[in-house]
Amino acid sequence: MLTVAGLVTVVVAASPAPAQISQVQVEEWTVPWPESRPRDPYVAPDGRVWFVGQRSDYAAVFDPVTEEFRRYELPEGAGPHNLIVAEDGLVWYAGNRQAHIGVLDPATGEIEQIRMPDDRARDPHTLVFDDAGHIWFTVQNGNFIGRLDMATRRIDLVEVPTPHARPYGIEVAEDGRPWFVEFAGGKIGTVDPASLRLEEFELPDRSGRPRRIAIDSHGDIWYVDFSLGEIGRMTTNGEFETWSVPSGPEGRPYALGIDDSDRLYFVETGPRPNRLVIFDGGQMRTLSVTPIPSGGGSVRHMTFDGDRQAFWFATDANTLARVRVPIEPPNS
């Protein structure tokens, strides 16, 4: 395990002013189970959208064609936090309050629970696939990065060396290496899949609170800083650059995604209503700021459907939302 500090060049930039703020269309559907905190949607290979109800212990699927919802009950008290859907249609979810990763077979409704091998790993948080048959995941309060072999069900846990770092958002780069942010540690981290050696990189301002992470086509790491109101980038050579979000320190950026044109989509959860922001990662400028019609309340995670060129997210206003990616960036 290695912590890297003082080895990077830090460049802090002011937020570039957009030429003209345009808006994109945000479509929302009311989830039929009130106050269930729908969150963390994921688009399955068949185009249907799965998500969890964190407060009501369910997984559900939405068909954008028929606009129908279907609910699957999860173990009582599981507190599902996140899910992802494999090519075979099996749904893998994080049992955040019961220290397990679950596997739901939608054809039968049967659920398999894979327990964490260490009692300290009590709260699996966010899951992501790699291309080698694994699921990588964060364990926020337990302070681990985990790897689950989907075939054998073996779980490897790597303890984060920074105490109480609260590893949060996680993504896997094209080379199969997972990258994650430490919400309370003020760092970006990565794990070598071969050796399970963990490396950390300090953010320019350790008081920051990075929530989510995205990786662009150049391999640069992007993140949103919830407390400082910034979007930041760590390049492949270890240099940092940050920009203020449109609402500044009160922006509270949370959910983050990236499209296949390296445009960053994130949600400012500080303003009421919440606001969806599109930021051009190549030109380093804000392209669009759009209020979320339902108000949002908070938007914690989003997913990009490259096949259909759309982002999906869920809101604390009990809605499921879709944003279609513009063919050309607004005001380009």
Task: Please report, for each region that a protein language model flagged, where it lies by residue.
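Conserved beta-strand positions in repeat-built beta-propeller and related beta-rich domains
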Residues: 50-55, 91-99, 135-141, 178-184, ...
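A short beta-strand motif characteristic of beta-propeller blades
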Residues: 27-31, 68-73, 110-116, 154-160, ...
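Beta-strand-rich domains and repeat architectures in extracellular enzymes and scaffolds
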Residues: 30-58
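Beta-rich, blade/repeat-based domains predominating
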Residues: 34-45, 76-88, 119-132, 162-175, ...
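Loop/turn-rich, solvent-exposed surfaces of beta-rich toroidal or solenoidal domains
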Residues: 250-278
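Blade-level signature of beta-propeller repeat domains, shared across WD40, Kelch, NHL, RCC1
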Residues: 297-332
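Short loop/turn segments that connect beta-strands within beta-propeller blades
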Residues: 63-67, 105-109, 149-153, 192-196, ...
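A short loop-to-beta-strand structural motif that recurs across blades of beta-propeller domains
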Residues: 58-61, 99-103, 143-147, 187-190, ...
